[in-house]
């Protein structure tokens, strides 16, 4: 009896169940497959829970970075601004489906806010960049979630400006989970390291900086003894293009230094050299004021090119001081002091021989022995005016003592006065010749010292310039 009742109830309910199933099937075929799939995936989905069925299994997040542009390098604040293409994917075990049940759909884009997303950040972030908002992610039917987005990254970087403008900077972008340990979230590299390093396919290579490579590096670190975290570093290596700074900074400084060296060929006994070098010094000072805003400045270091400018300024000051010294030396005839013997020997013989100027530095003063011999030969003539009294006691010049015998005693005293005037004129001329000879000696000494200081100055400038050029060449092609 009971069996008969059950069969009767089944016979009555079967048409109703078949009708309901047919109605549900008709409704499912009329709804779009994307809506049905979205409802299937997101219904009862808990985005606050890590998407694994076994909590002991870590979620592996694969990441990739492609540098698109170097926007700004702020040496003063030690900040690097880059524009990158960031890609990451992970497996969400709660977002899987059979494509045959949903019109062979193999991937779907859904809002990022609707699913679980790993908390991977860049440790060096110092400011929020102006990145476009990409609100969707791609999901494949195996549960693979792909998150692609461009990022404007403003990060802290230790910038070394000592080699400016031939500097190479190495800044890191460190991706790590802010909260989860490696037992929960592990990080891996999407592509091979060689491909990441040499990928410049989208880099805008028209700016001041040249991308040398992106070097990935993975490590595990611990902030506490029991908790380890995974991090992926990308070292962005960039090099500055120095052509603009060479043209606007180095070449004007080199031209001014060359003009200072050429200024040594002006005569040392003229005042034009002093005024010329003062003009160069003032011009270089104005040049430094103009380029001061171009040079990078930090609180912890100064670029070598700044030291180069300071040394060039010091060399110009030394050159001006040397010129003033030489001009003062060659105008020393006002003091009426002859060149000391030791200075004559040192400068006109030793230094002149060293500089191959010995023949030009030999004094042309007539020997004093001939004049003394002439005086001795004429001394026997006697002083004929000594018997006439009065002005005859003045000193007689060698020409007077060699003059013919005086006229008779009754000659006029005017003759002796005339001889006395002639003697005074001769003494004046001899004194003037002596002063001129002293001036010529000091001029020879000044010329030799000027040549010596010029060679020393030239060697210092060349040695300093060659050293800097070698250093900058090594840094440029390192």
From Swiss-Prot:
Q: Which Pfam families match?
A: Neur_chan_LBD, Neur_chan_memb
Catalyses:
Na(+)(in) = Na(+)(out); K(+)(in) = K(+)(out); Ca(2+)(in) = Ca(2+)(out); Mg(2+)(in) = Mg(2+)(out)
Mark the transmembrane ranges.
242-268, 274-292, 303-321, 456-475
- For this UniProt record, give its keywords in alphabetical order, as a comma-separated list: Cell membrane, Disulfide bond, Glycoprotein, Ion channel, Ion transport, Ligand-gated ion channel, Membrane, Postsynaptic cell membrane, Receptor, Signal, Synapse, Transmembrane, Transmembrane helix, Transport
Q: Report residues carrying sugar chains.
A: 28, 104, 170, 186
In the record, which residues are listed under signal peptide?
1-23
Q: Which GO MF term does the entry hold, naming one?
A: transmitter-gated monoatomic ion channel activity involved in regulation of postsynaptic membrane potential
Ranges where the record places region Disordered = 389-408
Q: What is its main location?
A: membrane
Quaternary structure, from the entry? Forms homopentameric as well as heteropentameric serotonin-activated cation-selective channel complexes with HTR3B or HTR3C or HTR3D or HTR3E. The homomeric complex is functional but exhibits low conductance with modified voltage dependence, and decreased agonist and antagonist affinity. Heteropentameric complexes display properties which resemble that of neuronal serotonin-activated channels in vivo. Interacts with RIC3.
Q: Quote the record's domain comment.
A: The HA-stretch region of HTR3A seems to be responsible for the low conductance of HTR3A homomers compared to that of HTR3A/HTR3B heteromers.
Q: What is this protein called?
A: 5-hydroxytryptamine receptor 3A
Species name for this entry?
Homo sapiens
